[in-house]
Amino acid sequence: MDIKGFYSGNIFDAYKYLGAHVKENEVTFRTFAPNAKKIELIGEFNDWNGTEMIRSNDGNFFECSIENAKAGMLYKYKIYSKDGSYIDHCDPYGFGMELRPNTASIIRDLKEYTFNDSEWMKERSDCKDKPLNIYEVHLGSWKKKHDNTWYTYKELEELLIPYVK
């Protein structure tokens, strides 16, 4: 990863470096935490007992590889602050997350996902010279069903698009 580009905010594929990356015989985990004293990786693969992550030379990234980790397993980062306190945190670059109230990340093998939007990508308009409107919303807190359960993404699509337009 281009570290200078990351620090300047000019890199848009940090997900290729950060997060949990499945390899043939192991999973490599990386995260960015410049203010952490140390980080331990906890998950199903180590019975939720911490595996200390290695700090990068610049001190801002942490990394470790786990041989018995597999796609579908749950994990979190146990992040220690300078005062010794810690918090268990999901992976901000995780490719899968548990549904709340649970908060663990889920190891996903991106090679197992096949995009099927090639026709749409071919037909979409080139609108780089037109204004762009970005609407950011947290779907879980935007709207719930009357019985206090959450909508599916498909159901929210039908509600949110007309709302934003």
Regions found by a protein language model. Give the residues of each.
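Short proline/glycine-enriched turn/loop motifs at strand-loop junctions of beta-rich domains
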Residues: 32-39, 46-48, 69
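Glycine-rich, histidine-containing beta strand-loop boundary motifs that form or position
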Residues: 31, 43, 79
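The feature marks proteins involved in alpha-glucan
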Residues: 1-28, 56-150, 155-159
